[in-house]
Amino acid sequence: MITVANLTKSYGGQVLYQNGSFFIGPGEKVGLVGPNGAGKTSLFRLIMGEERADSGSIDYAKSLRICYFSQNVGELKGRSALEEVVHGNPRLGFLKTEISKIEKALEDGDYSDELLEKLGDYQTEFEKLGGYDIEYQAAEVLTGLGIMPEAHHRPVESFSGGWKMRIALAKVLAQKPEFILMDEPTNYLDVESIVWLEDWLRSFKGAVFMTSHDRDFMNGLVKKVVEVNHKTITVYSGNYDFYEKEREIRRDQLIASSERQQAMLQKEEEFIAKFAARASHAAQVQSRVKKLDKIERIEVMPEDMAINFEFPKPPRSGNDVVKMDSVGKVYATEEGKQKRVFAGVSGVVKRLERVAVVGVNGAGKSTLLKVIAGLTEATEGKAEIGANVQVGYFSQYSMDVLNPQKTVFEEVRDRVKDKSDGYMRNLLAAFLFRGDDVEKKVSVLSGGEKSRLILATILTNPCNLLILDEPTNHLDIRSREVLVEALKSFEGTILIVSHDRHFLKQLTTQVAEVNKGGVTFYPGSYSEYLSLAGGH
């Protein structure tokens, strides 16, 4: 279907990949992985013809229908959500217009063979592209991605950025192309929408090539992984978990080969040094010098090693960390109406519990966390923090407090008091800020880097109740693993909202489900909750 052969691409003096090759066949689901800046998005753009390679080729049939979902959705306006999705394929619009024109000509008595043949061709193509059921498909996909039927006819301008991303994703899916490129499709989706998308893609007969920070999503779909890293493209025949294990095995084998080669080279060099001045060995020395010149050195690229950082032990809180008694919350809408978020919420969160707060988008998860954190008042009832409880709170808005003019190190120094420079550098290293990274200005950091910076400072301050609202947003898989390990070692209580199932499965001891204006508590892990709920 798509053959990439000997691909080389560079920007300025930086080589992204050299002589990289891989193949994606019909119906294959393939993951694309690699560190930030390795060239994942560039590879998508090369396939789409939006960028040119330095050398090599990307070959596929001209008739192949390809769609590309990227994080840059452009400006959406002038249509309803449903109309935007229906108009995702301009060719369908053209065909519909031409068919209408021909049908009008037929009504006027023009029955020429040429016109009838053209009508037949247009109708065949229109049907092949799904034109006759596109509205049904568009509505089904929008609903699956969490935009309910009552919102289908709302103007796209009325949706927030995250919901516009869903509309843009729906535009791609509803076209049912033969090949889909997807750059982080699970961003901004809740768990229910991610599960729906995973099921949809699993039954999709076309090929998919995608990046995703959601490990469970990748594991559930892909059977092949393409890695871009260290200027090379490497293919692994398995899901994400297989890729991680196989990558480690291959690296160990490479290190062993490199060590054997180094031992051999050292012996040869010792021989050359020992006999270089002896005329009787001149031929042998010359032969071995030539041999060494021809040997291609095995290069083992440096890997970021995990940093063992011991977070400070928080002060002990009382056993009852959070108490809620008939808590309710009502908001005033822009139209001046009252909107109830939840009511009658009662419960106690005990010390050392790790509670996942779950529910569909708009159910009130973030509002519940804000009420508990004291950032907004309950309209009814009472939410109380227990004795000796100190709160650390994180949300996507926490990043707004960062000073864009300061460096990463300066931000940490200002927020982590009475600690040495070495301590702060180790802290930053544990959150993947290493070497020159600590001197980066906050203004140039990505969303994921800003999240890591804030989380690092929260975890090293003496709080014993962490309230985390979507801490995994913008974090890649490696950063999420770093955060999981940090939270596992945290000797306090955690309330957390996240749409990453793998992340929640590793952490939680209790689940609070916000649904239909109430909250239900389920003892046990997130995996046990999913089993009860019939989830994935």
Where are these regions (language model features)?
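Intracellular alpha-helical coupling/juxtamembrane segments of multi-pass membrane proteins
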Residues: 246-302
